[in-house]
């Protein structure tokens, strides 16, 4: 192998067996016939040895190795073409990067490296003191990793720049430590530790005793740190500190704590005995023996015992004594088998769900109508039109029947409106001829049912070819000229006048009650 490098772009390769053996003898500390320490290659044959030492890959690795260890006595200085002092900084940058321990085959590759992220990151670390200056110290540090690890282990719990006790994280340099302490993970762990310390040492709610310190809960530096937030009272694990805070301040956690001790608030003991709270359902809900239900939380339980349903169940166990209620419904209706299930009205044969519904029912029209249907009405005018038996008939409880009109009304109001209306009165009048003054006998129901004999031969559609009007007007008038009177045949003159008269036929019989004169225009 030649003793010198070229211009830095390539290394002169040994040619032939003698040149290879000479290279091995000159660099026996790194080369041998069976092993190349620079390439970490094991050579098992003569041909493999010659091929390896004459390869370009081996020459590049040797050049990189010498560039890194150029200050060591073990590497001969004659391997380089010129001394480092004779080489400018620009030429050094194009050959190798002492910061990243890299060599380059051309200035283009070197320039690409210097503008890359890796070089910029390593340069920043070196400027901040993370990477020691001097490649000799770097080489020693890389050659003795065991010693460095031992020294780091001694500083695990004392050097904050190399170890985080809270997160159990180690750092290679101060920059990594600063990034960690300013990061989200470390801040979250700090918040978690603070919250857990507060809730496990001095946290308490108004309705409970102080929570005892839980040794199994996540504490700073414990093994469970970073894996969740446990609540031993509710036997659950929360994923974040926000969820834990929401849980311990929520109703479920408070109910779980309160379910372990009977309630002592004023007013609750009178409604439900403490045994209902401390019963076998403790921790699973709050039972109300009166209503036979279980509530999920103390808030629901308090709302239940102060609500209408619970009060109605309590009232249903004792007959009502309010004025006016006992008269309509006997106390036995409340003490019957339906107690606790509703309020029954024997009058209407229905069951109400609450005392409010019952009170509204007995004061309503339906209940009053049923009461009135059991006794004949005594109001003036009603009994004359409808017999008392109409109220006490089989339709009682289902409506109010009118035998005159053969209909059934749903309420007493409808019945009263019916008997005072025109339809009912007309039905009564149609059963007996009217005798009121001024109404002709022909206007009765029979008058509309059949034409009179006087005009039986005429149709009711009015005269044909004859005119009739008030005061002798010759203009023919239709049936509407008579107002509300129907065009009856009895009001029309006969077809022909009597034979003994030559005067126009006007007879007293043709005078209508309204003063109409009926005549035949053929007889003038």
From Swiss-Prot:
Residues 476-486 have a biased composition (Low complexity). Residues 453-486, 494-513 are annotated as: Disordered. A zinc finger (Matrin-type) spans 34-64, 92-126, 162-192, 226-260, 286-316, 343-373, 400-430. Zn(2+) 2 binds at residues 97, 100, 113, 119. SMART domains: ZnF_C2H2, ZnF_U1. The keyword Repeat applies. The keyword Signal does not apply. Keywords: Cytoplasm, Metal-binding, Nucleus, Repeat, RNA-binding, Zinc, Zinc-finger. It comes from the Eukaryota. InterPro entries: Matrin/U1-like-C_Znf_C2H2, ZN346_ZMAT4, Znf_C2H2_sf, Znf_C2H2_type. It holds the Pfam family zf-met. It is found in: Nucleus; Cytoplasm. Zn(2+) 1 binds at residues 36, 39, 52, 58. GO terms for molecular function: double-stranded RNA binding; zinc ion binding. The zinc-finger domains are required for binding to dsRNA, and also for nuclear localization. This is Zinc finger protein 346. It comes from Xenopus laevis (African clawed frog). The gene is znf346.
């Amino acid at each position: 192998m030649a003793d010198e490098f070229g211009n830095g772009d390539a290394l002169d390769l040994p040619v032939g067996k003698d040149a290879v053996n000479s290279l091995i003898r000159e660099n026996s500390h790194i080369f041998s016939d069976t092993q190349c320490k620079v390439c970490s290659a094991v050579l098992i044959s003569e041909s493999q040895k010659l091929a390896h030492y004459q390869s370009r890959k081996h020459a590049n690795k040797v050049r990189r190795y010498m560039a890194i260890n150029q200050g060591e006595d073990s590497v001969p200085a004659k391997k380089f073409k010129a001394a480092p002092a004779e080489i400018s900084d620009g030429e050094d940058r194009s050959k190798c990067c002492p910061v990243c321990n890299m060599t380059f085959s051309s200035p283009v590759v070197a320039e690409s490296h210097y503008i890359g992220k890796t070089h910029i990151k390593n340069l920043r670390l070196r400027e901040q003191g993370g990477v020691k200056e001097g490649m000799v110290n770097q080489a020693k540090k890389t050659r003795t990793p065991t010693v460095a690890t031992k020294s780091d282990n001694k500083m695990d719990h004392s050097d904050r720049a190399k170890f985080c006790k809270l997160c159990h994280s180690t750092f290679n340099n101060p920059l990594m430590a600063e990034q960690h302490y300013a990061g989200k993970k470390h801040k979250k762990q700090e918040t978690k530790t603070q919250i857990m310390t507060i809730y496990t040492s001095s946290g308490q709610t108004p309705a409970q005793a102080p929570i005892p310190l839980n040794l199994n809960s996540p504490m700073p530096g414990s093994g469970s740190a970073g894996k969740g937030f446990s609540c031993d009272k509710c036997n659950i694990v929360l994923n974040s500190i926000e969820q834990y805070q929401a849980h311990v301040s929520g109703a479920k956690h408070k109910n779980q704590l309160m379910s372990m001790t009977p309630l002592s608030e004023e007013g609750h003991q009178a409604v439900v005995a403490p045994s209902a709270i401390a019963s076998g359902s403790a921790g699973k809900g709050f039972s109300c023996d009166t209503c036979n239900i279980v509530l999920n939380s103390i808030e629901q339980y308090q709302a239940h015992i102060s609500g209408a349903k619970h009060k109605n169940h309590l009232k249903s166990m004792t007959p009502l004594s309010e004025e006016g209620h006992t008269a309509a419904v006997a106390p036995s209706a409340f003490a019957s088998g339906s107690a606790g299930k509703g309020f029954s009205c024997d009058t209407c044969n229905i069951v109400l769900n609450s005392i409010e519904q019952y009170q509204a029912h007995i004061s309503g029209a339906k209940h009053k109508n049923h009461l009135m249907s059991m006794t004949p009405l005594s109001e003036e005018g009603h009994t004359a039109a409808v017999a008392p038996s109409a109220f006490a008939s089989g339709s009682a409880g289902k409506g109010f029947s009118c035998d005159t009109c053969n209909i059934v009304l749903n309420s007493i109001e409808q019945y009263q409106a019916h008997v005072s209306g025109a339809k009912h009165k007309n039905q009564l009048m149609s059963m007996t001829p009217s005798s009121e003054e001024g109404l002709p006998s022909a206007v009765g129901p029979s008058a509309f049912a059949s034409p009179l004999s006087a005009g039986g031969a005429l149709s009711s559609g009015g005269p044909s070819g004859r005119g009739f009007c008030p005061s002798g007007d010759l203009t023919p008038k239709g049936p509407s000229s008579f107002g509300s009177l129907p065009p009856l045949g009895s009001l029309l003159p006969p077809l022909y006048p009597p034979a003994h008269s030559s005067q126009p036929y006007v007879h007293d019989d043709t005078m209508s009650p309204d003063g109409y004169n009926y005549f035949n225009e053929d007889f003038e």
